[in-house]
Amino acid sequence: MKTNLSSQITLHRVSPRYYRPENAFEKSVLTRLEKIPTDIYESVEEGANYIACEIAQTIREKQKAGRFCVLALPGGNSPSHVYSELIRMHKEEGLSFRNVIVFNMYEYYPLTADAINSNFNALKEMLLDHVDIDKQNIFTPDGTIAKDTIFEYCRLYEQRIESFGGIDIALLGIGRVGNIAFNEPGSRLNSTTRLILLDNASRNEASKIFGTIENTPISSITMGVSTILGAKKVYLLAWGENKAAMIKECVEGPISDTIPASYLQTHNNAHVAIDLSASMNLTRIQRPWLVTSCEWNDKLIRSAIVWLCQLTGKPILKLTNKDYNENGLSELLALFGSAYNVNIKIFNDLQHTITGWPGGKPNADDTYRPERAKPYPKRVVIFSPHPDDDVISMGGTLRRLVEQKHEVHVAYETSGNIAVGDEEVVRFMHFINGFNQIFNNSEDLVISEKYAEIRKFLKEKKDGDMDSRDILTIKGLIRRGEARTASSYNNIPLDRVHFLDLPFYETGKIQKNPISEADVEIVRNLLREIKPHQIFVAGDLADPHGTHRVCTDAVFAAVDLEKEEGAKWLKDCRIWMYRGAWAEWEIENIEMAVPISPEELRAKRNSILKHQSQMESAPFLGNDERLFWQRSEDRNRGTATLYDQLGLASYEAMEAFVEYIPL
């Protein structure tokens, strides 16, 4: 069973010669804008395994010399694959950590003595508890020390690092604001280990660990920039498209305290290891025509023309030969003969992505339409990772499919229970208890006792405590009710609303279980029952919480199993990926764009507002301060504006989709 198919999605084929040059000359040409040596790997596993091998080699070399190997290690998601490979090498290849010294790069402050959400605990769970390292060789900042002793404590931490001869290897991730460890924007090049106040972006990111922004510590004790740069070798890791923007700033941008990771440009032995998704904003991947000759394909041509339009401020049909020649695109003139020929091709390509019939227009020529006309009506399944992603990401299209008489099913893949605030539980329990009393059912003590029990639990609940199973159930019921209300508003019969409650999600914690066969079978059974002609899935692979990717992997795994068995329904089914909750499709990748009128946009907003528990007080709004309906409208209007600027029809808003073809 293949459970990581989303990681193999490439929106456009990147020629291997852009990221795996054949010789030193080619590499120097491709990377001439990059100021830190950067290696791009086809997968996270490939990159992580390479870094793990480099670390293992250093450990073994130090062992032979009878010396310690000093590692500075972070927590977080980026190094987790490296740690997994090191554990495998320890268990299967005899890699010993007896000569390894580990310094934890940072710790949240303040923490209570029994805090379970510390960075050090994460580091132990991911690596230290699984290898034979001497516990006396592990050092970490103390998140519980008194404030008046922190300055001296940090000075001694630096001394301890130096007492072992300095750091041999520093392993880094890169934060959303370009931070390394918790060196936030504004950190100085000569900074050492210190207490630092976390900015809102870092606290929002850390809130995934602590549950809510209110529970997240306001500061951190972190290794300084100069401490990290003092390492003999530095590896910066980044995986996934949500890291792409910061990688470009770090690798190609100027050295600046606004992007602390850019300080790595001053190190003579720093290396950046990224996967293809994280490389997408680097010039050699995103705009290869600026550094080399290109292997042109339709999507790369479209990307180049959109870029040229934005650079010149012109719509597609007004671009001239001069525009192409002056901006590194003369190869296209040689291929097509003139700007006019290129312009017409790309204009028509984009024009053909626009359709007001997302399920296909019956009795019409579908040669140049993104969806086929037959069969009509279609059976449609919209997979929604959380109980509101359907309306946030494709509420306009969903409503259009219903109005055009297709059989629309919505499958809510997870309960979304941990994203409901405690005050929502109290509010609903007030109602249930009051209802019980008003309608002469007060002698039934079950409700009143459960009401008192839940009130007591929530009152005594401490930061980091897990909700009881009863409270998680109530939170799940709240979200089910909201989803049903939104579905009814969109005229979807409730017998076509499916709550899958995939088991991987039901941990009661932010950290979820890995996807399992049970998750895939639930999805597969639904597909077998409905036999859809269209499937819509979440394409928000940069979702900061990871649930969207796992849910999409469950659908893709189920489809893959059906494909292996030769399921007949799959031969007449198309799969479309939507975005909207966390990002939007780039225009060069869009294959279907559904226009939304002002009235339809208002209806979409109303659908989103049915999910009242996900408004201002929702625990997981991410780093974007806008509410979900605001983000959605801004992105939909932004897509329509871009089409307008390129010289195509002007609409109020547009929802965009990319087709997924089973591998």
From Swiss-Prot:
Family label: In the N-terminal section; belongs to the glucosamine/galactosamine-6-phosphate isomerase family. NagB subfamily.
Family annotation (InterPro entries): Glc/Gal-6P_isomerase, GlcN6P_deaminase-like, GlcNAc_PI_deacetylase-related, Glucosamine6P_isomerase, Glucosamine6P_isomerase_CS, LmbE-like_dom_sf, NagB/RpiA_transferase-like
Listed CDD domains: GlcN6P_deaminase
SUPFAM superfamilies membership: LmbE-like, NagB/RpiA/CoA transferase-like
Record organism: Bacteroides thetaiotaomicron (strain ATCC 29148 / DSM 2079 / JCM 5827 / CCUG 10774 / NCTC 10582 / VPI-5482 / E50)
Top-level taxon: Bacteria
Active site, UniProt feature: 184
Name of this chain's protein: Putative glucosamine-6-phosphate deaminase-like protein BT_0258
GO molecular function: glucosamine-6-phosphate deaminase activity
